[in-house]
Structure formats: C-alpha cells, structure tokens
Amino acid sequence: MFRRKLTALDYHNPAGFNCKDETEFRNFIVWLEDQKIRHYKIEDRGNLRNIHSSDWPKFFEKYLRDVNCPFKIQDRQEAIDWLLGLAVRLEYGDNAEKYKDLVPDNSKTADNATKNAEPLINLDVNNPDFKAGVMALANLLQIQRHDDYLVMLKAIRILVQERLTQDAVAKANQTKEGLPVALDKHILGFDTGDAVLNEAAQILRLLHIEELRELQTKINEAIVAVQAIIADPKTDHRLGKVGR
C-alpha cells in the first residue's frame, strides 16, 4: 500500500512494512520524524521516541496536530499515507537541484495524457493516496465531508472553478458600476413627514431588494451545483444502469 513512497524515501523494508504491528508502526513514525520530516527539534523528540510508553498514542496525536495532518490517530492508514506524502515533498525540497532537470519519457507522457482524458473514470477511489488527497483538499477548502470521496472531489472542482481560478478572482475583484435610479419613480408606501428621511428609506429599500436578488442568485447556483453532483452516474453509483 505504501511501497512506492517508502521506496522513494529509502525505507529499509518497503515491501514488508506492516502498519498494524504496533511496535513496527511506532518505530516507523520515529524514523520518519528523525530522518525525513524533522518537524521537532532533536531535544523535543523524546516523547515520540519513547515507543514503549503508555502515553505514546497521546504524543503521536499531538504530533499529527503539530504537522497539520488532517487525519486523526484512529485513521492510521490515511495518517501514514499523509505523513509519507509530506516526507516525499520535503525530501524533494531538500534535493530540488538533483531532480529539477529530469525529463519525463515521451511514451509515458503520451500514455498519461490518454489516461487523464477522463480523470474521474480512471481514478481508483479505494486508493489511500486518493482518499488522503481529497480529504486534505476538503479540509483546506472547508468542504463538508461525504462518504463518497468522488462526490467530495467533484465539489472541490466546482469550488475551484467558480471561486479560485484567475478569471473567477478577477471577476470578483471587479468594481460594479451601478446605473442611476430615479427615486421618485419608486413609491415608498408610507410618509415619514420628512423629505430627507423618505429619500433615505427609498434608498434602503432598493439596496435590500438588490441584496435579496443576489441571495436568490447564489441559492440558484448552489441548487444547480448540488444537482450536478447527485445526478451524475459517475459520482452516484445508484444512478448507474446497464441496459434498459
């Protein structure tokens, strides 16, 4: 399950690593922090290194929080995969000069392009790498957790396309130029006895109407986005049909 990343990190036994073995798991976490992640100072790693302590799970849980891991101690496989991903990124950062000039093989590039044509179809939704990545993005973007990771991925894609692309950001930053409004054409319906107050009340009413229209637009967009997710057979297996 973790063989590729363990191999990339030069772990001594990538093929035989057993995360369910408590002693092996704790020793692995110590190795990962000491050799690859190095989040703590050397003098602060004592609690984590004390693998025989009954309080070790508490120290490990704190460690997960300190490195901003989105998973809890109960999600052992996901947490391990996330920590391995962090270690790989740090390893690359430490050796950027070594890897920056590597050129991918042309045949592999062509194969990858074909596979990526339909990314949602080719994804292995049971892969821990996929689950960990989707969960990390969902936590970062504050998207509610869903049992179907593919549904969460599509929600992430919609949010990124609508809010975080260059065009979306530029559009959000544009200053809206309003049109002049003739207040005398909008009947207030009551009289305060003061012309200035009447005019202020008319302005407030028009602003409130504009806010309601914007709210309705956002509600409609949200409904369409939800329908696009739940009505897609690729993300809702209940809608998938074979034959008639």
UniProtKB/Swiss-Prot annotation:
InterPro entries: RTRAF. Pfam families: RLL. The keyword Phosphoprotein does not apply. It is found in: Nucleus; Cytoplasm, Cytosol; Cytoplasm, Perinuclear region; Cytoplasm, Cytoskeleton, Microtubule organizing center, Centrosome. GO terms for cellular component: centrosome; cytoplasm; cytosol; mitotic spindle; nucleoplasm; nucleus; perinuclear region of cytoplasm; tRNA-splicing ligase complex. Keywords: Acetylation, Cytoplasm, Cytoskeleton, Host-virus interaction, Nucleus, RNA-binding, Transcription, Transcription regulation. It comes from the Eukaryota. Induction: (Microbial infection) Up-regulated specifically following influenza A virus (IAV) infection in a viral replication-dependent manner (at protein level). Widely expressed. Expressed at high level in heart and skeletal muscle. Expressed at intermediate level in liver, pancreas, fetal brain and fetal lung. Weakly expressed in adult brain, adult lung, placenta, fetal liver and fetal kidney. Overexpressed in many brain tumors. GO terms for biological process: negative regulation of protein kinase activity; positive regulation of transcription by RNA polymerase II; RNA transport; tRNA splicing, via endonucleolytic cleavage and ligation. One of its GO terms (molecular function) is identical protein binding. PANTHER family: CLE. Homodimer. Interacts with FAM98A (via N- and C-terminus). Interacts with NIN; which may prevent phosphorylation of NIN. Interacts with POLR2A. Component of a tRNA-splicing ligase complex with FAM98B, DDX1 and RTCB. Belongs to the RTRAF family. RNA-binding protein involved in modulation of mRNA transcription by Polymerase II. Component of the tRNA-splicing ligase complex and is required for tRNA ligation. May be required for RNA transport. This is RNA transcription, translation and transport factor protein. It comes from Homo sapiens (Human). The gene is RTRAF.
